[in-house]
Amino acid sequence: MVKKKINLKDITIIIPAKIIEKNLINCVDVCKKKYPDTPVIIVLDYLDKKKSLLQRKNIKLVSTGSISIGEKRNIAVNSTKTSFIAFLDSDAYPSKDWLENGIKLLKEKNIEAVGGTELDFPSQSYIEKCVSNAGRSFLVTVLNFRKNLKKEKYCNYLPTCNLILEKKTYKKVGGMNANLVTGEDWDFGERLRKNGKKILYSPNVRIFHKSRDLKNFFRQRLIYGEGIINLLKIKKNFFYFLSLIFLFFLVFLLSFPIVFFYPIWGKIYTNILIFYLAIVFFESAKISKNPLLFLGTFFTILIGNITPGIGTLIKILGFNLNSKKIYKNF
């Protein structure tokens, strides 16, 4: 039996971004090299003189102003004419047969959305390697399997940096929540499953995703913590409540002065802290392929655990971070 060839013209690659910068240009260059006939929609805050670097066959540039990434995706999807859509981050680029493998799985399996592994860029700085290591740890990333080449499995959600699905599926569940600055992919995955849809992780649907530097990793985790409260306002989900563990950890750390008034708390505090640091120590050793990365990975995991709690606490206290300004990947 002759296998039906996948029509790459019936898929639109959607790339939301703030501005035109080198990571986005590289992303588009790779996409067009691999998929010259596949439509690409790039949704930006604004267009500038660099737009000429992106203007080529089958590429549409859309300027929206400073809006949420979810709303940008909604605008892009509404302007597509294809049956399938593939979301990709501006600081990423597809690996071999990314679209082909994703569409094949959508057609052959009883699923409505598919995503896959996020591989490191071939060339990274020391800090980026440490941030990447932290992202592989269960202490920082709940769905850490997507950072590794793990076996195929069904998921509660997958991040929209690498997600392929039918346009009609996206529209049926109402698209992304435009009011969420972060966590829109969690919310989207929740609504997919609520409607009886299955989400599949496959190690064959791969992209290369640039790791953040320490400054932008700190910012990402800070906004992630703030976003937990916004998600809980939408739905009292166990997974969202579980994410409050970072807040509890921060409160625990801030309780140190109590030891001066209640010595018994000093013993409890010390034992818990030693136990936690031991876990971070062994986790850092396990995921650091190069011994030279161990110390950097250790401290990056600490930052990844403490910073979300700060973001959550700021939100609870009634303050709002300038998420759109703070949250960026370049």
Residues covered by each model-derived region:
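A recurrent flexible, glycine/aromatic-enriched loop bordering the glycosyltransferase active site
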Residues: D120, L143-I164, V181, D187, ...
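Conserved donor NDP-sugar-binding/catalytic core segment of glycosyltransferases
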Residues: D97-K129, V205
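Short aromatic/hydrophobic "clamp" motif used to bind/position activated sugar donors
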Residues: I85
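Membrane-embedded multi-pass helical conduit in multi-pass membrane proteins
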Residues: F246-L321
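Catalytic donor/gating beta->alpha subdomain of glycosyltransferases that bind UDP-sugars
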Residues: N177-K235
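Short, well-formed alpha-helical segments that are part of the catalytic scaffolds
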Residues: I19-K33
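Cell-envelope/extracellular polymer assembly enzymes that use nucleotide-activated donors
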Residues: K9-T12, P39, D187
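Glycine-rich, basic loop-to-helix element that forms the pyrophosphate-binding segment
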Residues: T64-T80, N101, C161
